[in-house]
């Protein structure tokens, strides 16, 4: 099997952008929207999917505006979940995952990403003892704000056509009027329940990273921050290329996408509590309770 590398981080931590940047170098075999949407469909083609996207008026992801195309790098969690498995890898889903690796095997290193596996990386390390891991981090307040924004966007009045193509579960939930009503109500920010739910997940995943990242040998892991990637994309990508022994990086095409906006009120009210709960993570990654990041850190 070709060398295997996982990009891991919280949802909305910058995994998509990092995956795009690395995919555009042409040095990796990556999973794409075409693979996910047409998985198991004989005779499918990127051109046919491109026409379908055009006919349905799907040009960008609702949550963040990322342009959609058959070649957009995507997460393997959808294939797992569409076949009845959890969104993260388990012993039961390894055979299906092996099929994904077989499809992607073209001689280049295989690069995959799945935020769901950020809190389950010890299993990946055990299941794939030669795999390497690229962890990307972002200030938790920004992660939570962005994740809540995406949740609210995909459960707004209009179905997210792109997510519906990717996820059978989303289609099923949307088709149930009662379920759709509940999620839409949560997406209004009622009682701040969506913020609390997302905050709990982010806190738990980051604490897991603090407690377990050192169990991975240093030769198998590298971490970077979204903030540093925005400030110096070429420098941070070169760190990854050096880590993977791939030489100099090609020229970049995807521009930086730093996003700044005032925190939503329901999140602002929780920042002190969150920074206290994640004090170890803040210290490890150089994040401050005021929502800023200390100067560049490399680990």
Residue ranges and their predicted role:
Residues 10:
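P-loop (Walker A) phosphate-binding loop of NTP-binding proteins
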Residues 7:
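Hydrophobic anchor at the beta1->P-loop junction of P-loop NTPases
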Residues 17, 120-127:
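A short acidic, amphipathic alpha-helical/loop segment
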Residues 113-115, 124-149:
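Conserved phosphate-donor/acceptor-positioning beta-strand/loop module used by diverse small-molecule
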Residues 1, 148, 155-299:
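PAPS-dependent sulfotransferases, especially Golgi type II membrane carbohydrate sulfotransferases
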Residues 16-29:
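A conserved segment at the C-terminal end of the G1
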Residues 34-111, 177-183:
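PAPS-dependent sulfation machinery
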Residues 109-113, 223-225:
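Short catalytic-loop micro-motif centered on adjacent basic/acidic residues
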């Amino acid at each position: 099997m070709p060398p295997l590398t996982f990009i891991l981080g919280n949802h909305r931590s910058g995994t998509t952008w990092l995956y795009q940047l690395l995919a555009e170098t042409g040095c990796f075999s990556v999973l794409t929207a075409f693979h996910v949407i047409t998985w198991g469909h004989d005779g499918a083609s990127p051109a046919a999917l491109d026409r379908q996207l055009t006919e349905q008026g799907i040009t960008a992801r609702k949550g963040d505006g990322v342009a959609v195309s058959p070649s957009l790098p995507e997460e393997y969690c959808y294939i797992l979940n569409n076949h009845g498995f959890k969104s993260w890898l388990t012993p039961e889903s390894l055979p299906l995952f092996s099929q994904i690796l077989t499809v992607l095997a073209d001689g280049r290193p295989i690069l995959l990403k799945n935020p769901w596996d950020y809190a389950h990386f010890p299993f990946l390390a055990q299941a794939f003892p030669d795999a390497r891991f690229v962890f990307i981090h972002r200030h938790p307040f920004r992660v939570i704000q962005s994740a809540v924004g995406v949740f609210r966007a995909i459960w707004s009045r209009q179905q997210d056509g792109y997510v519906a193509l990717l996820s059978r579960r989303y289609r099923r939930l949307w088709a149930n009027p009662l379920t759709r009503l509940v999620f839409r109500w949560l997406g209004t920010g009622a009682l701040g329940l969506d913020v609390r739910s997302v905050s709990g997940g982010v806190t738990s995943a980051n604490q897991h990273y603090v407690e377990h990242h050192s169990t991975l040998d240093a030769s198998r892991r590298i971490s970077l921050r979204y903030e540093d990637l925005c400030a110096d994309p070429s420098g941070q990508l070169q760190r990854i290329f050096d880590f993977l022994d791939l030489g100099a990086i090609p020229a970049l095409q995807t521009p930086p996408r730093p996003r700044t906006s005032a925190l939503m009120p329901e999140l602002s009210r929780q920042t002190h509590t969150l920074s206290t709960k994640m004090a170890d993570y803040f210290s490890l990654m150089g994040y401050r309770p005021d929502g800023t990041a200390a100067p560049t850190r490399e680990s």
